[in-house]
């Protein structure tokens, strides 16, 4: 979106596409509203009375403060001088990421280009309250030298988060709510900013990078401020949001009922199946599994999830080419503990892959959480499932051999875990469609993974042994999660203590599996309590978590 108003302080005869009212450019302008600006401002509801006199009429805006238009009217027609060949054309400035519309006389519009802006009476502020018209108002003395600041920080998925921070004595208000001195809150599109008094509305904030909040259900908007898009999938998208009461960041998955229903032969069955899966997943309680916080059933489904700011394991591996073995061990141990918990509660994930493993922070040592239960199945009485689903590269041989027609069990998740561990340790996949001489299906069903000796020279024999015992074609001979947790590579007390310390930091706790004293075939259940977890109900649904 472009801005067309010009600065009163400008002496140039050139018109500018973007606003020149930024103080970083030296001085502010009173808004010289063009018809497009007036239309843009008219989209904001409820500001017409408070903005009276702020934006001039279209007739007023037809004159330039520098006299450019009147000069052009008197210049005789002549050929324009050509630009010398050695002269570089001027490069356009950076596009604004937000715009503040002034609602009162004495205040000016601001296009935000920089990442940080201070507002106040102090001349060091990027937006200084020093205009003569503003000084004559009765509220001028109620404004602090440094009243508030607006800034943005990089969040997950390289998306910026915009905040407003109160530093005033008399208060800064967003949508009539006091922020509080020294406190911050996220600033969403169309927010009203008032100074000193909640009714003294001075600005409307327009985030030029996000959609309008009004497209979301009112009950959702009452509790959450929607922000940037984090990702998208076949059935919807995931957005970052903020809980209004606490300013806590969350992720909200939006499942399109229409798109979801199109994939079902019986649309009437769609809503009950999604709701059933949501209810089951809400009962899962494990520090290494994404937790559903809330659900809104409106025109679409809105599922509120905890936000993992470290991004996907896939991106972490790609960014580092490969992971250190110690880091792999910490992450993989958590994956095993989480999947073991799922299996003991009668759930098979069926789509485990690095994209579905999320990291709690950008730190190398961090918690992981399993997500995307879109392909998950609740085991029935036979403990076998059918249907072909999941990502081909990570599918177990028994799934591909049967084309989804024969039954298969929780061993499919253990195969996928083996593929993930292989990728983390080596930085490349064991099976790939790029091997043109052998099809992906044949590679997997024969168990012939791509082993590059020079890549594995610095990987321990114990780690490689665990990979080999997970990537076994026969599901009956493949290690279970229990057996994998008892593997010598994972008998690392230092790693386990690090995991426990991370849990303490996150205010979580879990009883770790203990290796049996005699044999590795003994079963020791993970001591986690889940109330009301169904264990015999079948469910087929397209996923509640991206």
Curated annotation (Swiss-Prot):
UniProt-listed InterPro entries: FHA_dom, Kinase-like_dom_sf, Prot_kinase_dom, Ser/Thr_kinase_AS, SMAD_FHA_dom_sf
Disulfide bonds listed in the record: none
Physiological role: Serine/threonine-protein kinase which is required for checkpoint-mediated cell cycle arrest, activation of DNA repair and apoptosis in response to the presence of DNA double-strand breaks. May also negatively regulate cell cycle progression during unperturbed cell cycles. Following activation, phosphorylates numerous effectors preferentially at the consensus sequence [L-X-R-X-X-S/T]. Regulates cell cycle checkpoint arrest through phosphorylation of CDC25A, CDC25B and CDC25C, inhibiting their activity.
Pfam families noted in UniProt: FHA (PF00498), Pkinase (PF00069)
UniProt record similarity statement: Belongs to the protein kinase superfamily. CAMK Ser/Thr protein kinase family. CHK2 subfamily.
Cofactors, names only: Mg(2+)
Residues that bind ATP: 231-238, 253, 306-312, 355-356, 372
Residues annotated with Phosphoserine modification: 71, 82, 383, 460
Name under which the protein is recorded: Serine/threonine-protein kinase Chk2
Residues where Phosphothreonine is found: 68, 77, 387, 391
Post-translational changes noted in the entry: Phosphorylated. Phosphorylated at Ser-82 by PLK3 in response to DNA damage, promoting phosphorylation at Thr-77 by ATM and the G2/M transition checkpoint. Phosphorylation at Thr-77 induces homodimerization. Autophosphorylates at Thr-387 and Thr-391 in the T-loop/activation segment upon dimerization to become fully active. DNA damage-induced autophosphorylation at Ser-383 induces CUL1-mediated ubiquitination and regulates the pro-apoptotic function. Phosphorylation at Ser-460 also regulates ubiquitination. Phosphorylated by PLK4.
Tissue specificity statement from the Swiss-Prot or TrEMBL entry: Ubiquitously expressed with higher levels in the thymus, spleen and colon (at protein level).
The entry's keywords: Apoptosis, ATP-binding, Cell cycle, Cell division, DNA damage, DNA repair, Kinase, Magnesium, Metal-binding, Mitosis, Nucleotide-binding, Nucleus, Phosphoprotein, Serine/threonine-protein kinase, Transcription, Transcription regulation, Transferase, Ubl conjugation
Chain intervals with Low complexity compositional bias: 8-70
């Amino acid at each position: 979106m472009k801005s067309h108003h010009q600065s009163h302080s400008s002496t140039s005869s050139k018109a500018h596409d973007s606003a020149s009212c930024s103080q970083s450019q030296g001085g502010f302008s009173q808004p010289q509203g063009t018809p497009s600006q007036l239309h843009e401002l008219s989209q904001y509801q409820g500001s017409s009375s408070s903005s009276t006199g702020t934006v001039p009429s279209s007739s007023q805006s037809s004159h330039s403060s520098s006299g450019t238009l009147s000069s052009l009217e008197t210049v005789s027609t002549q050929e324009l001088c050509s630009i010398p060949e050695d002269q570089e054309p001027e490069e356009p400035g950076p596009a604004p990421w937000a715009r503040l519309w002034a609602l009162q006389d004495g205040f000016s519009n601001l296009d935000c280009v920089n990442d940080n802006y201070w507002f106040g009476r102090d001349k060091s502020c990027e937006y200084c309250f020093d205009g003569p018209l503003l000084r004559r108002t009765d509220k001028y003395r109620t404004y602090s030298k440094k009243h508030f600041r607006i800034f943005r920080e990089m969040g997950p998925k390289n998306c910026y988060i915009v905040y407003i921070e109160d530093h005033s004595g008399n208060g800064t208000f967003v949508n009539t709510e006091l922020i509080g001195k020294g406190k911050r809150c996220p600033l969403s599109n169309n927010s009203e900013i008032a100074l000193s008094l909640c009714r003294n509305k001075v600005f409307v904030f327009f985030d030029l990078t996000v959609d309008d909040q009004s497209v979301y259900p009112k009950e959702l908007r009452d509790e959450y401020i929607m922000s940037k898009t984090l990702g998208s999938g076949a059935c919807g998208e995931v957005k970052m949001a903020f809980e209004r009461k606490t300013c806590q960041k969350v992720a909200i998955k939006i499942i399109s009922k229409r798109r979801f229903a199109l994939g079902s032969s019986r649309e009437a069955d769609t809503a009950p199946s999604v709701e059933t899966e949501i209810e089951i997943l809400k009962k899962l309680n494990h520090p290494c599994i994404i937790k559903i916080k809330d659900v809104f059933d409106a025109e679409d489904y809105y599922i509120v999830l905890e936000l993992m700011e470290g991004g996907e394991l896939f991106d972490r591996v790609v960014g580092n080419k490969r992971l250190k073995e110690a880091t792999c061990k910490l992450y993989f141990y958590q994956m095993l503990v989480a999947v073991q918990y799922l299996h003991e509660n009668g759930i098979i994930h069926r789509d485990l892959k690095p994209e579905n493993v999320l990291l709690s922070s950008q730190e190398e040592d961090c918690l992981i959480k399993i997500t995307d239960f879109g392909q998950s199945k609740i085991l029935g009485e036979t403990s076998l499932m059918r249907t072909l689903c999941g990502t081909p590269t990570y599918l177990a041989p028994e799934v591909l051999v049967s084309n989804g027609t024969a039954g298969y069990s929780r061993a499919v998740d253990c195969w996928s875990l083996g593929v993930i561990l292989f990728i983390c340790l080596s930085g490349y996949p064991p099976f790939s469609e790029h091997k043109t001489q052998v099809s992906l299906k044949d590679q997997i069903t024969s168990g012939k993974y791509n082993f590059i000796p020079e890549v594995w020279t610095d990987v321990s024999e114990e780690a490689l042994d665990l990979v080999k015992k997970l990537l076994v074609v026969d599901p009956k001979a493949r290690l279970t999660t229990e057996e994998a947790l008892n593997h010598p590579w994972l008998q690392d007390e230092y790693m386990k203590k690090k995991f426990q310390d991370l849990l303490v930091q996150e205010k979580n706790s879990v009883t770790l599996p203990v290796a049996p004293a005699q044999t590795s075939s003994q079963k020791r259940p993970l001591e986690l309590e889940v109330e009301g977890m169904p264990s015999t109900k079948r469910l087929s649904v397209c996923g509640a978590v991206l």
